[in-house]
């Protein structure tokens, strides 16, 4: 039974009913698109409740049905979030990169890649590998710069880090 049918939360049920009605009324929406949306919606619901295995299962189903690249990018991005939450950072990076291939302006994926690269840089620094750490920090900076160029009012903390570490590109500001 789909998650949307067994949820006891009134607000979630209301959202589900409204989303289903909107889908039914939208002209030109194929049955596959409707199924993809239902799986995506159920994946988001499961993810918000910490049911990551169920969320991934729903996202995989949505990904198999979804044809739109931008929609696919958000599915992949959410899968990356789950892997990041589970501490599977390399797998999270893979999914964020796949999302960016489909949607190069997905700022949240750019930011999350930068955050993970920065984290890996910190780990390398703690392990005494300054050369690897600096390379990872430089790579993180490039992703943050891309995100800031798209959304200049976001990522203030990243902008400050770029400035204080001398990695701020003057063209950025």
UniProtKB/Swiss-Prot annotation:
Essential for the assembly of the photosystem I (PSI) complex. May act as a chaperone-like factor to guide the assembly of the PSI subunits. It holds the Pfam family TPR_7. PROSITE patterns: TPR (PS50005), TPR_REGION (PS50293). HAMAP family: Ycf3. One of its GO terms (biological process) is photosynthesis. Keywords: Membrane, Photosynthesis, Repeat, Thylakoid, TPR repeat. Its main location: membrane. The keyword Membrane applies. It comes from the Bacteria. Belongs to the Ycf3 family. It is a peripheral membrane protein. InterPro entries: PSI_Ycf3_assembly, TPR-like_helical_dom_sf, TPR_rpt, Ycf3/AcsC/BcsC/TPR_MFPF. One of its GO terms (cellular component) is plasma membrane-derived thylakoid membrane. TPR repeats lie at residues 36-69, 73-106, 121-154. This is Photosystem I assembly protein Ycf3. It is found in: Cellular thylakoid membrane.
């Amino acid at each position: 039974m789909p998650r949307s049918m067994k949820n006891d939360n009134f607000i979630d049920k209301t959202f589900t009913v409204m989303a289903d009605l909107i889908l039914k009324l939208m002209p030109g929406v194929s049955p596959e698109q409707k199924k993809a949306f239902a799986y995506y919606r159920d994946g988001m619901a499961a993810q918000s409740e910490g049911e990551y295995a169920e969320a991934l299962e729903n996202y995989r189903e949505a990904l198999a049905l979804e044809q739109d690249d931008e929609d696919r990018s958000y599915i992949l991005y959410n899968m990356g979030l789950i892997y990041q939450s589970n501490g599977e950072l390399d797998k999270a990076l893979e999914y964020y990169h796949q999302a960016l291939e489909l949607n190069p302006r997905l700022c949240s994926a750019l930011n999350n890649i930068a955050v993970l690269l920065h984290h890996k840089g910190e780990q390398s620094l703690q392990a005494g590998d300054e050369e690897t750490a600096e390379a990872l920090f430089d790579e993180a900076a490039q992703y943050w710069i891309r995100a800031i160029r798209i959304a200049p009012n976001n990522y203030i903390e990243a902008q400050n880090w770029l400035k204080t570490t001398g990695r701020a590109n003057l063209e950025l500001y």
